Design a protein with these regions (language model features):
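Hydrophobic membrane-targeting segments
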Residues: 1-53
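Internal alpha-helical transmembrane segments of multi-pass membrane proteins, especially GPCRs
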Residues: 8, 12, 18, 122-125, ...
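Alpha-helical transmembrane segments
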Residues: 22-42, 139, 146, 181-196
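Predominantly long cytosolic amphipathic alpha-helical stalk/bundle segments
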Residues: 43-137, 148-160, 187-245
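A cross-family signal for key residues in well-ordered alpha-helices
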Residues: 128, 141, 165
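Hydrophobic alpha-helical transmembrane segments and adjacent short intramembrane/lumenal linkers
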Residues: 157-171
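Hydrophobic alpha-helical transmembrane segments of polytopic membrane proteins
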Residues: 171-185
Length: 245
């Protein structure tokens, strides 16, 4: 019996379950493709932005870094660094206290990082839901198919293949379709979650490097210290840490 013949023997309720699974599969693939394109764009633009950021760390101009951030708006690193350097430039031009400047810059970096992470995670909840619930939808269709098979046996009084094939087909197709939809969603969710962790590390490292460069804090460990852990009293008012660029 071919697959099309199996589908032809599926009941109305089982068909509705399969249509639901097929629609969820389409939505899942759409989310996967969209996230893949966005993450690839973020990675590529970040690689292009990093040389400009390194140039700034070695004595480049503030305005050059701001312009580089505008040219690479899809880069997660550029988004965070731009938020910090724009805040720093605004505070510097206003002539505020350097201690307040550090607090404002670190706050801008934290806020931008949080917002960027929210954007990166958008859609992953849907993939997680698909991966965890679709197998149960398929199992539900399986149970319905088996029930229909037993109902056919009870109605005819015999258990021949021609009697139960419709219910069995419904059960098998529902199970297979549920697994088929769930596996890509789970794999994609785990892959994208790993990418987000990598992006988070890159954003945190860039934030720490920016604060270290702007305020000359030698004690700052780029890889180990969160931006939120930087303490304002470490900056000395009027010292080289607040030298105009």
């Amino acid at each position: 019996m071919s697959f099309t013949e199996l589908l032809g023997q599926v009941g109305l309720f089982g068909g509705a379950v399969m249509v639901c699974l097929a629609l969820l599969s389409v939505f899942s693939v759409g989310v996967i493709v969209d996230k893949h394109r966005r993450f690839r764009s973020a990675s590529r633009q970040s690689e292009k932005f990093k040389p400009e950021f390194k140039k700034f760390l070695h004595g480049g101009e503030v305005q050059d870094l701001i312009e580089a951030g505008r040219l690479h708006q899809n880069s997660h690193v550029a988004q965070v660094v731009s938020a910090g350097i724009i805040e720093y430039d605004g505070v510097r031009q206003s002539g505020r206290d350097p201690v307040a400047s550090l607090e404002l810059v670190t706050s801008a970096l934290r806020d931008s990082m949080s917002e960027t992470l929210i954007q990166l995670k958008r859609g992953l909840g849907f993939l997680a839901t698909i991966g965890s619930t679709v197998p149960f939808i398929g199992l539900f269709g399986t149970v319905v198919g088996i029930i229909n098979a037993f109902r056919s046996i009870a109605a005819t009084g015999s258990g021949g293949m021609s009697v139960v094939s419709g219910g069995i087909a419904e059960a098998l197709v529902s199970t297979a379709l549920g697994i088929f939809v769930a596996i890509p969603a789970v794999v994609a969710f785990n892959h994208f979650t790993g990418k987000i962790e990598t992006f988070h590390v890159e954003m945190n490292r860039a934030s720490s490097q920016l604060v270290n460069c702007l305020f000359k804090i030698p004690e700052l460990e780029v890889l180990d210290v969160e931006v939120a852990d930087v303490k304002a009293p470490m900056v000395k008012k009027g010292g080289p840490a607040y030298a105009a660029r």
